[in-house]
Regions:
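Cofactor-binding loop segments of dinucleotide-utilizing enzymes, especially the Rossmann-like FAD-
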Residues: 9, 34-37, 91, 115, ...
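Short alpha-helical
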Residues: 12-13, 94-95, 209
Length: 232
């Protein structure tokens, strides 16, 4: 029975997730849903930029052989298509949070995906709807909140706490006893030393080295990371 939907349509995210699923799960995929406006793309022009045509785009309301639905009021579609389980891979943590609230009301199961190469060092707690890409390391007694996306090559050391609906981009390294708040975005190749606290809704720019705590709703960048501005 094809009773699984995926929220999110980008080849850089959803495409990778579908590619990582085993055959059994792929056969159960029903459709793609997005709460975001789907941009109009000149596919021929895009393929000229990359002649091997490896990037996939929505064509005739389909991608990866699955129908695509763009709608903020998605509950009706889920019911009509008899969807019982979903992966949620929309762009931002706030969007994922809003979708989670609706899905919980409808009692639709929110699925997690943890790649087989991920190393879990024990006594870990992992929330609902978490997606962890290949070659990540989750240290002893570290916890991950709901709706977190952890991209490839992240190393989260022991006794860390990652809040709900965070986006952790590739090759993040944290020291022990680090705490990252809810709705944070940590960009590519960031290093965070031991016992750092990063507040809710904060962002850290690419390649930064975090040596000091970061308050709520702040953007920090650099080596060492310094305050840039309040995060909108």
């Amino acid at each position: 029975m094809k009773d699984i939907a995926i929220f999110g349509f980008k080849d850089s995210s959803t495409g990778q997730l579908i590619n990582m699923l085993d055959d059994k799960l792929r056969r159960k995929l029903n459709c793609i849903i997005s709460i975001n406006k789907i941009p109009k793309i000149n596919i021929a022009e895009e393929h000229k930029k990359r002649p091997n045509k490896k990037n996939e785009f929505i064509l005739n309301n389909k991608i990866y052989g699955l129908p695509v639905f763009q709608e903020k009021n998605f509950v009706k579609t889920l019911k009509e298509r008899k969807i019982k389980k979903v992966f949620v891979f929309e762009d931002s943590g706030q969007q994922r949070s809003n979708i989670f609230k609706q899905l919980k009301k409808e009692k639709i199961k929110i699925l997690s995906f943890i790649h087989s190469s991920v190393k879990l060092m024990g006594h870990n707690t992992i929330g609902k709807g978490v997606i962890i890409f290949p070659d990540c390391y989750l240290g002893y007694k570290s916890d991950i909140g709901d709706g977190v996306v952890i991209q490839s090559g992240c190393r989260i050391e022991h006794h860390n706490v990652i809040g709900n609906f965070c986006d952790l981009n590739p090759n993040l390294t944290t020291g022990g006893f680090t705490k990252i708040g809810n709705y944070c975005e940590i960009n590519i190749s960031v290093d965070i030393i031991n016992r750092i606290r990063i507040g809710n809704f904060s962002r850290v720019g690419t390649g930064s080295l975090v040596l000091k705590n970061i308050k709520d709703k702040e953007l920090h960048y650099g080596r060492p990371a310094k305050f840039v501005r309040k995060n909108k």
